[in-house]
């Protein structure tokens, strides 16, 4: 594996295996891991906890201007703190999932969190950064960019299985409808819409195992290192 500074940007919608693969890749590369999606989920939870309507942009901006957020960059840790309390389970709940697109679409919210994301990546020096706009907005100069995708049905099934395993009472059709709805919101928002960077490698994970996706990403990292050494 290449040593020294390294930034890998991994983007894509939910249900593509992005988080699991990004954590595994960071571990293989002995790198830090930054889940930017979790940061938007924490912001959404913070808004909901205060009884604010996510559609009230002014109130959301005010509530998230100073966010008491702390997130681990250890790929083996899922700890996410809001005001000192670990909320990693709460931010994956249905209410946050239904509202995170609305909160993250607000330009001022994105500006604040993007500044934090850039600072954390720079501090880590060697980091796998996962999100929806890393290659297109947050770290546009990242030497390695991958965009993971999969069909809506496959992604809905993965989320349904994940929620069921976590003991949540979910309906597949409702999960699929939410996946389609969120895709529409994320890809059409004015601020940093979800789309591949022009220089991103597109990886369709629909029929791939996590190990296959991981091997593919490692190949991209190694190929990038070889080009840099030429």
Curated annotation (Swiss-Prot):
Listed SUPFAM superfamilies: P-loop containing nucleoside triphosphate hydrolases (SSF52540)
GO terms, biological process: nucleobase-containing small molecule interconversion; pyrimidine nucleotide metabolic process
Enzyme Commission no: 2.7.4.25
Enzyme class label: transferase
Keyword tags: ATP-binding, Cytoplasm, Kinase, Nucleotide-binding, Transferase
UniProt-annotated binding residues for ATP: 12-20
Primary location class: cytoplasm
Subcellular location: Cytoplasm
Pfam families: Cytidylate_kin (PF02224)
UniProt xrefs under Gene3D superfamilies: P-loop containing nucleotide triphosphate hydrolases
GO MF entry, a single one: CMP kinase activity
HAMAP family: Cytidyl_kinase_type1
Family indicated by similarity: Belongs to the cytidylate kinase family. Type 1 subfamily.
Protein name per its UniProtKB record: Cytidylate kinase
Native source species: Corynebacterium glutamicum (strain ATCC 13032 / DSM 20300 / JCM 1318 / BCRC 11384 / CCUG 27702 / LMG 3730 / NBRC 12168 / NCIMB 10025 / NRRL B-2784 / 534)
Organism ancestry: Bacteria, Bacillati, Actinomycetota, Actinomycetes, Mycobacteriales
């Amino acid at each position: 594996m290449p040593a020294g500074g390294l930034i890998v940007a991994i983007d894509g919608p939910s249900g593509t295996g992005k988080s699991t693969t990004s954590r595994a890749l960071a571990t293989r590369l002995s790198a830090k891991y930054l889940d930017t999606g979790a940061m938007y989920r924490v912001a959404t939870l913070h808004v909901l906890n205060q009884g604010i309507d996510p559609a009230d942009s002014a109130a959301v901006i005010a509530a998230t201007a100073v966010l008491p957020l702390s997130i681990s960059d250890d790929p083996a840790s899922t700890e996410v703190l809001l005001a000192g309390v670990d909320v990693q389970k709460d931010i994956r709940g249905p209410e946050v999932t239904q509202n995170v697109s609305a909160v993250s679409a607000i330009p001022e919210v994105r500006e604040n969190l993007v500044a934090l994301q850039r600072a954390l990546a720079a501090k880590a020096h060697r980091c796998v950064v996962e999100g929806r706009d890393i290659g297109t907005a947050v770290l546009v100069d990242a030497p390695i960019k991958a965009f993971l995708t999969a069909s809506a049905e496959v992604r809905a099934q993965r989320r349904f299985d994940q929620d069921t395993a976590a003991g949540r009472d979910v309906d597949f059709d409702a999960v699929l409808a939410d996946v389609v709805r969120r895709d529409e919101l994320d890809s059409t928002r004015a601020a940093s819409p979800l789309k591949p960077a022009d220089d991103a490698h597109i990886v369709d994970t629909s029929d791939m195992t996590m190990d296959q996706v991981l091997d593919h990403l490692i190949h991209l990292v190694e190929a990038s290192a070889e080009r840099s050494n030429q």
